[in-house]
Amino acid sequence: LLEGRENLGGTWDLFKYPGVRSDSDMHTLGYRFKPWIHDKSIADGPSILDYLNETVDENKLREHILLNHKVNSANWNSEQSHWELVVKNDEQLINMTCNFLFLCGGYFSYSKPHMPSFKNYENFKGQIIHPQFWNDQIDYENKKIIVIGSGATAITLVPAIAKKANHVVMLQRSPSYVISRPSEDAVNKFLRKFLPVKVTYFLIRWKNILWQSYTFFLARRFPDKIKKSILDLLKDELGHDYDIEKHFTPSYKPWDQRMCLVPDSDLF
């Protein structure tokens, strides 16, 4: 296994911003063979990183992993019937070959994320921070903060920084669908009182997979009804005098894009 970074964990090791968490339940996001045993199924980043490292150690995978080995190129050699890789380790280039190649590198750059530009960017006197490069030295207590965007990262970040900041505004170009659900699975907590961990995990995993598949089917089959249901839930959260149409009504149908998950209504 070749890992370009100095640590395992990918997103869960890299992202340090306040509130970093999963936006899927860990019974479906987790491995089939390793039960998720924590109470919260919508889990924080450090807990997920611990889970990944436990999995690596329990299966004795660490000895097979090369850290700081970034794949620069991979080409198929038809004559030799194998893959030819050029791998960078520090400043050294290493040639490797393999018969089978699995690419699990994600879809964005860890070192060069998209950084939007805007007018008078250079004249702004405050800090401009990309969440991907958040570190423990950033002090946002009692600060006035604008978060640009309303996707999964913003939905996660805003409730966390609002606890210490003076004032937080989420600035969006267009709304996203936002759905609230409990961070703890009540059925899971109930079944764990009577059933073995592995049995409970299996049942909850399939309960969630089937439920999510069913709701996805309904959203594609009856988009207008599902949209109304989502907006009605938001009205219950924010009050019927809140401008849901302006701030939380996307121009697209439910599940045309991934929905944003809000555990325990923390955004509201």
Where are these regions (language model features)?
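Flavin (FAD/FMN) cofactor-binding and adjacent substrate-gating region
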Residues: 19-32, 225-249, 260-266
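Short beta-strand to alpha-helix junction loop
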Residues: 36-54, 66, 148, 218-228, ...
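FAD-binding beta-loop-beta segment adjacent to the flavin cofactor pocket
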Residues: 13-24, 115-122, 137-138, 267-268
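Beta1-alpha1 glycine-rich phosphate/pyrophosphate-binding loop at the start
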Residues: 1-65, 172-173, 237-242
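Short glycine/proline-rich turn/loop motifs
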Residues: 30-37, 211-213, 248-252
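Feature captures the FAD/FMN-dependent oxidoreductase FAD-binding
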Residues: 40-109, 230, 237
